[in-house]
């Protein structure tokens, strides 16, 4: 799998650094955890955007590398 799993630098959310759209589609961690793609947040720069349309997520990923933060765990340090 391209990309790596790491923690968000601003909180304790699990974050996935996905390098391209194919990685997002085939990410074993996503499949294993049965992540609902509607819960995917795309982090670009300092903005956090929610894309409920999977095609929109893919479009963004194909344009540039983004940090995908999966809102599946409660944050211990909300911000």
Swiss-Prot record:
It comes from the Eukaryota. Keywords: Mitochondrion. One of its GO terms (cellular component) is mitochondrion. Its main location: mitochondrion. It is found in: Mitochondrion. This is Uncharacterized mitochondrial protein ymf22. It comes from Marchantia polymorpha.
């Amino acid at each position: 799998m391209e990309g790596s799993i790491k923690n968000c630098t601003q909180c304790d959310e699990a974050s996935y650094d996905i390098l391209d759209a194919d990685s997002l589609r085939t990410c074993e961690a996503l499949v294993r955890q049965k992540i609902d793609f509607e819960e995917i947040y795309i982090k670009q720069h300092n903005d956090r955007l929610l894309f409920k349309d999977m095609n929109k997520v893919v479009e963004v990923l194909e344009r540039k590398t983004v940090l995908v933060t999966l809102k599946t765990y409660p944050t211990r340090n909300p911000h």
